[in-house]
A protein has these predicted regions:
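Positively charged n-region of N-terminal signal peptides that target proteins for export
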Residues: 1-7
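A residue-level marker of the well-folded mature domains of exported/periplasmic proteins
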Residues: 4, 20-224
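Bacterial N-terminal signal peptides
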Residues: 8-16
Length: 224
């Protein structure tokens, strides 16, 4: 939820910067569909921020769109460009598929704020995210200590995107310090409880002994 609050703050700063140069401001906000608790919070805070700003300044127009897939989000951003937006706030559904369209927005001179999952190229003016490498390092050190620095583990990754890579890479880097800890398998569960459950069941059938499992999670949803 802290990232949602940061998103509201970024929009606030963005509006302030435009207020001196444009009588009418159009801001597009593109985020994933509220398909679980964390994205539900993102949607709620985005709607709240929009309502509050429009009550204070009728010259600010927001276009909030949600997408259940990268393809839908690309189409949404294209539609926002047609609407003539001055700025785009985007939480990418997936980093790689969204980078080209966001780069197009950026090259058109539209102010871009990227939130959380990031893009594969620096094609934003502002990037807001948590300490994802830190999350990977802390979880790796904790797990190593709990295992007494030896054992076999499996990993459930998130969606293949920038923040997932940052967390997993940092986790793996710490693991190198402990050669007696072996990573048996690491697969993307796409931050889905159901998908994670399926992969974990396969892990349990495939490997004779698993001492621990690492889940790269989005927020506070239950791990498989």
């Amino acid at each position: 939820m802290k990232k949602a609050l940061l998103m509201v703050l970024v929009v606030t700063l963005l509006l302030s910067s435009f207020a001196f140069s444009a009588p009418k401001i159009r801001i597009g906000v593109s985020i994933p569909t509220a398909d679980h608790g964390w994205t539900g919070g993102i949607n709620w805070w985005a709607q709240k921020a929009i309502k509050e700003w429009q009550a204070k300044d009728p010259d600010v127009t927001f276009f909030l769109v949600t997408a259940d897939s990268p393809a839908k989000q690309v189409a949404d951003v294209e539609d926002l460009m047609v609407k003539g937006i001055d700025a785009l706030v985007i939480l990418a559904h997936d980093s790689a598929p969204l980078t080209p369209i966001v780069e197009k927005v950026y090259n058109e001179g539209i102010f871009v704020v990227s939130v959380d999952r990031g893009l594969t190229k620096p094609v934003e003016h502002v990037y807001v995210a948590g300490d994802n490498p830190g999350l990977g390092r802390v979880s790796a050190e904790w797990m190593a200590k709990e295992l007494n620095y030896k054992g076999s583990i499996v990993v459930l990754e998130g969606i293949p995107c920038v923040i997932n890579s940052e967390r997993v890479d940092a986790f793996n880097e710490v693991k190198k310090k402990y050669p007696n800890i072996k990573i048996l398998d690491s697969q993307p569960a796409y931050w889905s409880t159901q998908k994670g459950l399926e992969i974990m069941e396969n892990y349990l059938q495939k490997y004779d002994k698993i001492d621990a499992g690492k889940a790269v999670r989005r927020g506070r949803e239950p791990a498989p």
